[in-house]
Amino acid sequence: MHSNVYLPETFLEKIKTILPSALNMDDFIAYCQQPLRKSIRVNTLKISVDAFLTIAQEKGWTLHPVPWCETGFWIEADESKVPLGNTAEHMCGLFYIQEASSMMPVSALFLGENQFESVLDTAAAPGSKTTQIAALMNNQGILVANEYAASRVKVLHANIERCGVRNAALSNFDGRVFGGWLPESFDAVLLDAPCSGEGTVRKDEDAMKNWSQESVLEIAATQKDLIESAFQALKPGGVMVYSTCTLSEEENQQVCHHLKHTFGDAVAFESLSSLFDGAEKALTEDGFLHIFPQVYDSEGFFVARIRKLASVNSPDVNKKMGKFPFQKASKKESALIEKSLSDSLDISLPADSTIWLRDNDVWLFPNALEPMLGELRFSRMGIKLAEKHKNGYRWQHQIATTLASGDEKTVVDIDTDAAREWFMGRDIYPENSGKGEVFVRYQGAIIGLGKWVSNKIKNGLPRELVRDKNLF
C-alpha cells in the first residue's frame, strides 16, 4: 500500500462529479493507494514475442498479457539482486519498461492501419511511445520525435539507440510550432500531452502535492494550443491520437471538443470500442477511453482517436533556417562507403535510406525525411554510420544496434563476465584474437561494435549507454 499518497479533498470532490455511475469512490481511493503492477513491452525490432517468452520462462519471469498491446505484459520478476533495467535483456534493447496504460495511445493510433509513412510524436521523451511507434513502423518511413525539454532529449536519444530505432529524427521545440512549420505533413500524429498528472499517483505518491483547479485550467489552455497545432500538422485523411495521464475533463474531453469547435467538420472522433476486449468499460459517449485506476488496475488515463477529414488553414510563419550542414553523398561516394561497410562488417544498407555527409561524418537518413529537411531544424536525424579518417572509416555503434542481424561473418560471442565488462564500458579479452572491427554478441543478441587491438576488443559503447554497477 502507498499509505502516504496525497489526494487533496478538492480533487476527490471533483472526481465524485465525473466518476461514472458504475464506479465508486471507495474503489478509486483504494486503487490510488496501491502500487502499480510492473509492466514491460517487447521490442520487436530486436526479438519476436515468442522468442522473448522463451527467455522469460528460462529466467523465471511470470508474464500476463496487456489486453490493449500485443507486445505488452505485466511482469512478476525477482529484482532483489538485479533490477529489470540492469538485466542483459533490457540493456540489449529486447524490452522496454513501460507502464501498461501508456501503451494504449500507440495501439489506438495504429488501430486498423497497415502502415504510416510519416509519424509525429509531439512530446516524445523519455521514449516509451516513440520506440513503440518505431517497432510498429518496422523502422520504415520517418518518425519525428519531438521533445520540448532540452534536458530530456539526451534520454530520448539513448532509448532510441538502445532499442535499435533508425527511422527517427529528433527535434527540440515547443509542440505548438508544428502546425506552422510542417503543415499537413504527417500521416499520423501522437499528442501525449503534458498534463496535471492526476492519474500518476500510483507511481508517485507526491504527484498531487501542487495540484489545484487553477493549474488544471492553465494546463488545459496549453493543451488546446497543442492539439490545434498537431491537427494542422496532420495530412487530410490522417489520424491523430490525443492522450493524457490525467482524469479531469477540462484536460481531456473538453480539449477534444475545443478542436471540434475550432475546425468543425474537418474533425471526426473515431470510437475506440474495438481496441480490445473490455474497452467498453471505459468508453465515453464520444468513443474516447476515460480510464479510472480501478477499471483495469492501471494508471488513470485518457485516449481519443481523431480523423482529419479535410484540409484546414495553418498559421503563416517566418522561417530562418540557416544553411543545412549536411550534403547528400554522390553516387560514387555512396558506392565507396557501402563497399567498405560490406567488406569490413558484412553489412548492407537498407534501400529506403540515403547516405549524407557532414564534414568527415557519414550519416544514414530515411528517404521519407528528405521533404522535411528544409522545413524544420532537427537536433539529430537517422543514424551515424562512420567517421572518415585517412585510412578509411571508423564505424559507429548504431550500425550494431540498428543494422546488424547477428548473421554477419564479423561476430564475436562473449560470456557473461565479458558482457558485464562490456556494458561497464571496458575493453574485453576473448580467448581467440582477431583483427579489424567486429560485432560483439551475448546470448544471441548483438550488444555493440568493437575493434581488435592486439589481444583485446576495444569497447565502442557510447557513454550514455554505459552502466557501472549492479549488472546481471
From Swiss-Prot:
Task: Provide the binding site for S-adenosyl-L-methionine.
Answer: A123, A124, A125, P126, G127, S128, K129, E147, D174, D192
Q: What class of enzyme is it?
A: transferase
PROSITE patterns assigned to the protein according to its UniProt record, in alphabetical order: NOL1_NOP2_SUN, SAM_MT_RSMB_NOP
Which GO BP terms apply?
Answer: rRNA base methylation
Keyword Nucleotide-binding assigned to the entry: answer is no
Residues of the active site? C245
Q: Which InterPro entries match?
A: Methyltr_RsmF_N (IPR031341), MeTrfase_RsmB-F_NOP2_cat (IPR049560), MeTrfase_RsmB-F_NOP2_dom (IPR001678), Nol1_Nop2_Fmu_2 (IPR027391), Nop2p (IPR011023), RCMT (IPR023267), rRNA_ssu_MeTfrase_F (IPR023545), RsmB/NOL1/NOP2-like_CS (IPR018314)
- A GO term, aspect molecular function: rRNA (cytosine-C5-)-methyltransferase activity
- Say what the protein does: Specifically methylates the cytosine at position 1407 (m5C1407) of 16S rRNA.
Which HAMAP family would you find in this protein's record?
Answer: 16SrRNA_methyltr_F
Name under which the protein is recorded: Ribosomal RNA small subunit methyltransferase F
Q: What is the lineage of its organism?
A: Bacteria, Pseudomonadati, Pseudomonadota, Gammaproteobacteria, Vibrionales
